[in-house]
Amino acid sequence: MPIKEPDVWALIWSWLQTNLSSSSAQSAFWALFISLLRFGFMRKKPAIRYVLIDAAMCASIAGVAVPICTHLFGHTEYSSFLGTMIGFVGTEKIREFLFKFINRRIEKDDNDDFRSDI
């Protein structure tokens, strides 16, 4: 039975330390945590899929920003926090850009349809 063998738990613990102590995994967990905090503090109650999409976007941006912050600043302790913060700000800007882009396309298409009727 694996519960009574301490070697199994030692292997599990060493795997967790090896794989979850990387800055990318920490950034992904921070992104999910920040997204859940945002979900809790917002007055609107978005669907859980939007929270997960927001966390995935934040984690992907943070995954790119963490090695850059580590290279520029040299502090591995603060790079996951800075990367997550950059990822969170990045998701807001990406969302604003997409809404502006979609609204422009809709207005442009509406104007083109109106001109073709004349």
Curated annotation (Swiss-Prot):
Keywords assigned by UniProt? Signal
Query: Does the record bear Signal in its keywords?
Result: yes
Q: By its UniProt entry, which Pfam families does this protein fall under?
A: Phage_holin_3_1
Q: Key word Signal present in the record?
A: yes
Q: By its UniProt entry, which InterPro entries does this protein fall under?
A: Phage_lambda_GpS_holin
Q: Where is the signal peptide?
A: 1-27
- Name it: Uncharacterized protein HI_1416
Q: Which organism is it from?
A: Haemophilus influenzae (strain ATCC 51907 / DSM 11121 / KW20 / Rd)
